[in-house]
Amino acid sequence: MGLLYKGSKLLNIILDSLEDQEGGAMYISCDVSNGGPVEPETGYVPNNPLFGLALDSPQQECAASCVGCLSCQGNTALPISSLTSSDFDCGGCFDPTIGVLGSQINTTPPASNLSASGSGVGNHNNGAALAGNGNSYWSTDEMASTFPGLPPLDIDPLPSLFPFSPCGASYNFASNPHQASLSYTVHPHQMLISPNGSQQQQSQSSTHPHQLQSQHMQQALTQASHGGNALHNHNSSGGNGPGGGGGSGSGSACYYEAATNAPAPPMYPSMSVNVSMNMTMHHGYGADGGPVPMQCSQMNWTPPSNSSAAVNVLYPPLLSPTHYPASATYSFTADFRAPPPTALGALPSLADKESPSPPASSTAAALGYYATGGVGQGYTPPHKSPSYQAAALSLGLAAFEDEEESIEDGDADADGEGSAGGDMKPNLCRLCGKTYARPSTLKTHLRTHSGERPYRCPDCNKSFSQAANLTAHVRTHTGQKPFRCPICDRRFSQSSSVTTHMRTHSGERPYRCSSCKKSFSDSSTLTKHLRIHSGEKPYQCKLCLLRFSQSGNLNRHMRVHGNNANGSGAGGGSGNGSGNGSGSGANGSAGAGSGLIT
């Protein structure tokens, strides 16, 4: 009893030290042969590699070559000193004719099966190298160094604390880079599988189920490109199939894909995979270049038909990953099968998606709308007489059609656009009511009301409200008259003068006074006539402050001031006063005034 008490105390120390390690413990629920479930308290397994994997095998009868396990000793004792094989591998403790349990959770399949892989690319167990490891994981020296101050563990058998056998958990810690280790967490019913050879932190155990699908699809496509067959072995429990490891194959979830046969089944974002706990991972699980944690949403371990127990480990539902590491293979989940012809027929063609060209009837209607003045009805091109058009064609006067006013008065309008009777012209002068077809013409007209003359002659300092008038005025200094009448060969310095002169030959008088019904050939003459009815006199002498209705009359009055300076103002006044007509009368009054001044 004293020795048993010491052994129990030593076991408690070992369990406490192991629970302090990272990873904690896990719970599993087992169904034993009698059908009664085992409570989680009795199924508690510490994070102790001594007892192999947490998912232990079902109970079977051991072979005669077994050196001693719980099954052989009637679940009474566990002689630790007798476990000398590689990582506590029973080394064929079960009858191979019944079905070696290592096919479910053993990582060391027979070497003969490894050589029969053929063209399969999914099963990379490397079992030959693992089975060749004949050293024990914990030697006597390591036990002494791990627990200083304690004698080597050479104790009597202890009472069994666990209702299942540690056999079959050949958990080799060899240097195979594709062999996975178990990282136990502190949460019940959760287990994290990491594809690298070391235990991972829980914070690094992010889940990427799409990588499973991506790697499987890459395997299938790669093998199909070589003309071979791809074997995706999810649980490595296949029988003697192509590329398969050892095992009974009843609980396997392998699917065999031929490169030239039926296409692969569609992948789904959240898979329910039947997996036997084979810890030697294939190339398809995770990336080879770095640790890529993986996790499935549900794992169902199905024992072979001749086994007596089953272990069902359920995991919480898996959330969709939102981030892929930089070292992972970026992929998408899709069904690579070609859609059926019916589905393709239901899709609209690209020609249907394009907007059709408008029919000829609508195009003709639109053209007719523009032709009939549906848009821009407010603008009517100015009418040109046939005689003027013929003269313009013969002389090439198109470049001078913008010269609108004469030199004598700067308020002449362009091509008759200054008439008050213009139809639907939006540019209206609010001072005199005149309308113009263009805003620039209205702006020029407003200068006549404001008296602005921004264009000045460099020779005589005479100013004008329009640039065309200044250009025509400069020609008076040079004597240039480029415009000629085709009928009487009379020449003019500006094009507007030719236009007005051509109306004298045709007799056309398009501008009519609304008061006396008198008509005129140009707009400037009508403007002068309208000032008689209105009494407007916009031109004023700066010396005597007399006002005139026409700029020509003011110019003649200024000559009088020049003559009076020479002493001939009275004679000029009497002479001018004897004239007739409104123009002569104005000149006479101006002469009389100048005589009074002198």
Curated annotation (Swiss-Prot):
Low complexity: bias regions: 198-216, 224-237
Main localization (coarse): nucleus
Alphabetized UniProt keyword annotations: DNA-binding, Metal-binding, Nucleus, Repeat, Sensory transduction, Transcription, Transcription regulation, Vision, Zinc, Zinc-finger
InterPro entries: Zinc_finger, Znf_C2H2_sf, Znf_C2H2_type
Presence of the UniProt keyword Cell membrane in the record: no
Localization of this protein: Nucleus
Gly residues compositional bias, start-end: 238-250, 568-598
GO biological process: regulation of DNA-templated transcription; visual perception
Biased composition (Acidic residues): 402-416
An example molecular function term from Gene Ontology annotations: zinc ion binding
Domain of life: Eukaryota
Main function: Transcription factor required for gene expression specific to photoreceptor cells.
The name this protein goes by in its record: Protein glass
Organism: Drosophila virilis
Gene name of the record: gl
